[in-house]
Amino acid sequence: MEEDIDTRKINSSFLRDHSYATEADIISTVEFNSTGELLATGDKGGRVVIFQREQENKNQPHRRGEYNVYSTFQSHEPEFDYLKSLEIEEKINKIRWLPQQNAAYFLLSTNDKTVKLWKVSERDKRPEGYNLKDEDGRIRDPCTITSLRVPVLRPMDLMVEATPRRVFSNAHTYHINSISVNSDYETYMSADDLRINLWNLEITNRSFNIVDIKPTNMEELTEVITAAEFHPHNCNTFVYSSSKGTIRLCDMRSSALCDRHSKLFEEPEDPSNRSFFSEIISSISDVKFNHSGRYIMTRDYLTVKVWDLNMENRPIETYQVHDYLRSKLCSLYENDCIFDKFECVWNGSDSVIMTGSYNNFFRMFDRNTKRDVTLEASRENSKPRAILKPRKVCVGGKRRKDEISVDSLDFSKKILHTAWHPSENIIAVAATNNLYIFQDKVN
């Protein structure tokens, strides 16, 4: 980034508002497409909302970074598994875009059990002048047809349609936590707590199990899969993380079932920091390759770590996200916040890392300058095109006017899901049921 991260002026824009929010309105995933022109969000009500970026306007250059609603559709419905007497939530766990091949857009969305491939396309013309149908679509009496008509296309108001093209189901016993599109653009993988499956985008009735960590005796279970992602360039390589804080790199060329990893990334635990909560806070909630595929970023409860693929024994960078919460782990355990799963993202050049925290705070770390900043996504501070001010958390002692005490943080306001535009300094931040777009200020 051209300027120091803590001195940059950041514009904000407030997109999605539900004054009377219900559980179904809570945003559960955020994802830009490969060009950054579209931004998709999924929520706990099973809906997908797609936003489209404003086109360039010389008269209003500041509107270029704004996103407006492009399409809204119901992706998943609540279901009931009668064999196991379990409700299957409609909540969208993940959205992943496929690279654009033509005028239409394609995306994968998943809830706990079922992945769907959606086609989002535009229509601004409609056919008229059928021989066997009238203009309302009713079948005409063949006896009344006296002339042959050539159907024509007439202009109509632009309509955006979302249609399900594939439904990939019945392959996961446990809850799906990740989907990742392969760099061959023909396959993708879906991961649940104990297994990872490989799918062909054209075939819905068959998948290949590539990782299975389920023990013969479930009482021997010591860890679960928490996230998985394909390498951005090598279609045979992928990583998955676990609740024990380990990351495994697997190569599908070595064997069809990748139960034996090629590399294991794990940081030795510091005995002086050992506590009752050590195993819980070391669980990895997100794993991401950088754009070159040389580095992996992981997020656990208190830190973000960057790993070099060539060095397995420790991360090359560790960033403290909210270390001031270390003294609060007991109360965070009691209110279940310690199990929150925060995501992390790279910027387009891999020089800055972003991840969320509590009190609607989100953190940015500049890898080059080692500077970091805490910003807040809230309606009070984020009027459209307002400049965000850095926030600081005070742990103890005297508190300055611009600081907030760690004891007054609101743990019900949390930023779990964030996304970064693939090439520009535009970010999307989901704060419970509200979506914020922030961008570098254009002078």
Curated annotation (Swiss-Prot):
**Is Glycoprotein among this UniProt entry's keywords?**
no
Database matches in SMART domains: WD40 (SM00320)
| GO annotations of cellular component type | cytoplasm; cytoskeleton; membrane; protein phosphatase type 2A complex
Location(s) in or outside the cell: Cytoplasm; Cytoplasm, Cytoskeleton; Membrane
Predominant location category: cytoplasm
Q: What does this protein do?
A: The B regulatory subunit might modulate substrate selectivity and catalytic activity, and might also direct the localization of the catalytic enzyme to a particular subcellular compartment. Negatively controls the initiation of oocyte maturation.
Binding partners and assembly: PP2A consists of a common heterodimeric core enzyme, composed of a 36 kDa catalytic subunit (subunit C) and a 65 kDa constant regulatory subunit (PR65 or subunit A), that associates with a variety of regulatory subunits.
Q: Please give the family membership noted in the entry.
A: Belongs to the phosphatase 2A regulatory subunit B family.
Q: Can you say what this protein is called?
A: Serine/threonine-protein phosphatase 2A 55 kDa regulatory subunit B beta isoform
